[in-house]
Amino acid sequence: MSGFPSNRVLGSGTVLDTARLKYLLGQRLCVDSRSVHAFIIGEHGDSELAVWSSANVSGIDLEDFHGLCASCQDVSFREIYEDVRDSAYKVIDRKGATYYGIAMAVMRIVLSIIRDEHSVLPVSCYIDGNYGLNDLCIG
């Protein structure tokens, strides 16, 4: 579509949902979300998945951190995941669209590229033959 080679094209992937997950975890665990390391993978939407097995707060497993944290709220990781997954619907109900959130996610991606930050972001890319998959964008 763009005329660019596929290795020069990327999509926003789950950058927005990952940011929402990190924000909610930080809020509920009483830490700066920049200290939370967790990802949403898959599609942006109903079938996205939170990768709990690698999620941590500054290297400490989420469950362990929650157990050590005296000021933390009672945390249900399932509820946090559901809040992230369903957040777009809540925004649409209130504002009619979600364009500000995705605009912020795209800005994050673009700034990372422009500044050569070497950031790890859950963007999507075109797959044609990798992993036995063809003609597909995944994140």
Predicted regions and their residues:
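Rossmann-like NAD(P)(H) cofactor-binding subdomain of soluble oxidoreductases
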Residues: 1-22
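Long, compositionally biased stretches enriched for glycine and/or charged residues
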Residues: 26-139
